[in-house]
Amino acid sequence: MENKIHFDRSRQPETVIPERLEVPEACEYRTASGVRIYVLPAPEYGVVRLSFVFRAGSSWQKVPFCASATVNNLAEGSRDMTARQIAERLDYYGSWFDVSMDRDWSVVTFVCLSKFFDKTLEVARRIMLEQEFPQEEQIGRASCRERV
């Protein structure tokens, strides 16, 4: 016996405006070097989202495509990890990595389960602080594009 839910698509659903909307207040911290850190606690979700936001969008670059190339190649290797190792490590912990860029900002985001935050943070540290753009990785990507 199968229960099927039928939606009447010819009628727009009723709009419901919530009586209250609770938005938790972010806490601001500063590191010794003056970097601002904003924390929006929501422990009930068991997920951590860590975003690094840089004033480094396309309007700040002196060489065309420099900002885009830099942010898009961040996961291509670190001092001691290849792009594949980075991807496998993040995948192993179910972590997610994304970059975005606009005219004003470059954003690097990591999302992971709270219980794997320390492991994901270690990979993030390597990507953000020990970054290298290994020539072998760049050549490999270029040859893949040529084959397509």
Question: What are the language-model segments listed below?
Answer:
Residues 2-7, 87-145:
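Acidic/histidine-enriched segments that form metal/cofactor-coordinating
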Residues 1-88, 122:
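His/Glu-rich zincin catalytic helix
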